[in-house]
Amino acid sequence: MELRLFVGLGNPGLQYTQTRHNAGFLAVDALAKRWQCSWVEKSRFKGYLAEGAGPGGRAILLKPTTYMNHSGQSVRAVADYFRLPPQQLLVLYDEVALPLGKIRLRPEGSAAGHNGIKSLIEHLGTNQFARLRIGIGREPPPPVLTNYVLGKFAPEEQEQLPAILDGCVEAVEAVLAKGLEKAMSIYNARSFGSPPDP
């Protein structure tokens, strides 16, 4: 089976731990735990790399340390080194347009205002790569977006996270085992975690 690269987007540093914008980091951390592989910092790739075996073959996990807006530098370096075309890439990242508990697999698409994805498109020269968008919701009334995404998950949201991250792992493993289209039909309609009581 072909080698696959799974990239989680986020910002490095303790101050960004458990923030909504780091949902991608949290998701690939969950994958690393599931596949029992360890993170190693690789300066040549400007990120943390973990290599393991998922369903269907060998997989590489990546957490860029370039900060969100320059994630494409790290992804391009890894893709070039391992000679991976965009079709063997899946990017996991936060999505304010989806409520907490929802995830969406897509085969391709625009950046839709996400600076991390914008950087990937610029450095890879294409938007033809799969992605898993992880819903982080949006406070009503809409706040300043930057403050919201860089804020930490609220305590009641933290309670939902384990189930949401389990859903991300299941969806990625379904992509590997059954293909993207089948995984989309299963997971794009599901919700994970119980919303807090009103």
UniProtKB/Swiss-Prot annotation:
Compartments, record wording: Cytoplasm
- Which species does the entry assign this protein to? Gloeobacter violaceus (strain ATCC 29082 / PCC 7421)
Q: How does it assemble?
A: Monomer.
Record-given protein name = Peptidyl-tRNA hydrolase
Give a short account of what the protein does.
Hydrolyzes ribosome-free peptidyl-tRNAs (with 1 or more amino acids incorporated), which drop off the ribosome during protein synthesis, or as a result of ribosome stalling.
Please provide, alphabetically and separated by semicolons, the GO molecular function terms listed in this UniProt record: peptidyl-tRNA hydrolase activity; tRNA binding
Extract the signal peptide range: none
Q: Which gene encodes it?
A: pth
**Positions in coiled-coil regions:** none
Q: Which UniProt keywords apply?
A: Cytoplasm, Hydrolase, RNA-binding, tRNA-binding
Q: Which processes are annotated in GO (biological process)?
A: protein quality control for misfolded or incompletely synthesized proteins; rescue of stalled ribosome
